[in-house]
Each structure stands twice: as structure tokens, then as C-alpha cells.
UniProtKB/Swiss-Prot annotation:
InterPro entries: Alpha/beta_knot_MTases, Rbsml_bgen_MeTrfase_EMG1/NEP1, Ribosome_NEP1_arc, tRNA_m1G_MTases_N. S-adenosyl-L-methionine binds at G178, G183, I196, Y197, K198, E199, P200, L201. HAMAP family: NEP1. Belongs to the class IV-like SAM-binding methyltransferase superfamily. RNA methyltransferase NEP1 family. It holds the Pfam family EMG1. The keyword Cytoplasm does not apply. Homodimer. This is Ribosomal RNA small subunit methyltransferase Nep1. The record marks R60, R101, R104, R108 as: Interaction with substrate rRNA.
Length: 220
């Protein structure tokens, strides 16, 4: 069983210090919602983000969307060999049941995440998605993996195929992929840092390479 954690993800509701910004208010009105009820999104809120010291990396729910679509539609997940978690910059964790079918449409995904932040579980009878306050280290402690690997551009360089074989040496490894556009992890991490390419890759590309090559080693 592989545990995939999208960590320090830039997935959050509009923070209090930005809720009165004109671009936030305008976007919220167009969606018939309050500013505090909408996701922070750099596509619409880039002028507001300029006022934050780390604004260049925030407001990227699209990264989480692409990572989750790729992971949940993977052969590994369909074979019951994958568990996926989303950890956010605000130390929240989203638990996702393997049978969950997320919206392919980005705007519908945004609406789903906004509902999840508000209601904490979706739907209430099935709990396909639920969110809890938890740090990354607490998530790792709950999972109890027999190995932890951190995908990092400064990690030990190995081919995706070699990393897939390495993962297969363990019963329940965890792989941590950053859910942010650039920069480093915000959380303190313990584990082996791995790089699968000579240049930085986007998070969803890393997810694809890890899952496909683990599948190749485990299933075929």
C-alpha cells in the first residue's frame, strides 16, 4: 500500500487579512458568496496576493486538483493499492476515500472544496471527503509507514524506474509531494529526499511518475 501525501498544499479559504481587498470582494459577489467562503485563487486574486510576503506561492488549488485527478484515476488506486491525503499550509488534512470521483471541471472542484471547508465532511452519509486539523508529522504518525520519501529537487537523484523499484521494497511506504508551485516545504520533514529528474518538476508530473513506476514494479 502506497500512501501519497500532497503536503503544504496552497489550498485555503481567503485569509482574514485579504477579505476586504477589492478583487476578493468583487470575485465573491460574482459567485454570490461571502469573501471568507471562497478559495484563495491566484488566477482571480493576484493583486490581493501581492500584499502577502509569500503571496507568490499561495492560492493554487489547481495544483491539488491536478494531483488528485491523476492519483485517483491511476491503476494503482483502482487496484486498491493507494491512499491519498492532502495536507494544507494551515495544517489541515483532507482524507479521501479511494472510490471518490472528483469533478474534472476545475470550477466544480473549487465549489466542492469550499463546501468541504465549511461542512468538514462530504457527503455526510458516505464521508468520501473529510477534513481535520492535523500537522504533517501527525499524519505520518497516524499512517505508520515503514519508509518516508520526500520528493525534493535537492534529493538523491535516481531514475523514476529505480525509485519505483525502491518503493516496492517496502510494505507501506509514504511519498510526500509538495502541493505548491515553487520554493520549499513549510513543514519540518523527516525522511529520505529523492529527486527523479535533473530539473524541478510540477507536482502533478511527480505524482504521475511515482505512481506509474511503482505500478510497474508492483503489479506487472
Amino acid at each position: 500500500m502506497l500512501h501519497l501525501i500532497i503536503a503544504d498544499s496552497e489550498l485555503e479559504l481567503v485569509p482574514k487579512e485579504l477579505q476586504n481587498h477589492p478583487s476578493i470582494i468583487s470575485h465573491a459577489k460574482r459567485r454570490f458568496k461571502k469573501p471568507e467562503e471562497i478559495l484563495l485563487d491566484s488566477t482571480y486574486h493576484h493583486t490581493a496576493l501581492k500584499s502577502l510576503k509569500d503571496g507568490e506561492r499561495r492560492g493554487r488549488p489547481d495544483i491539488v486538483h491536478l494531483c488528485l485527478i491523476n492519483a485517483l484515476e491511476s491503476i494503482l488506486n483502482k487496484e486498491g493499492k493507494l491512499r491519498v491525503y492532502v495536507h494544507t499550509r494551515n495544517n489541515e488534512v483532507i482524507y479521501i476515500k479511494p472510490e471518490t470521483r472528483l469533478p474534472r471541471n476545475y470550477n466544480r472542484f473549487v465549489g466542492l472544496m469550499e463546501s468541504l471547508f465549511k461542512n468538514r465532511v462530504i457527503p455526510k452519509d458516505l464521508a468520501l471527503l473529510r477534513i481535520e486539523n492535523k500537522t504533517l508529522s501527525e499524519i505520518i504518525g497516524d499512517i505508520g509507514p515503514d519508509a518516508v520519501f520526500i520528493m525534493h529537487e535537492n534529493g538523491v537523484l535516481m531514475s523514476p524506474q529505480s525509485f519505483g523499484r525502491k518503493l516496492n521494497e517496502y510494505i507501506s511506504p509514504a511519498v510526500i509531494v509538495g502541493g505548491f508551485p515553487h520554493g520549499d516545504f513549510l513543514s519540518v520533514l523527516e525522511g529520505e529526499k529523492i529527486s527523479i529528474y535533473k530539473e524541478p518538476l510540477m507536482a502533478w508530473s511527480v505524482v504521475n511518475e511515482v505512481l506509474i513506476n511503482y505500478e510497474g514494479s508492483l503489479l506487472w
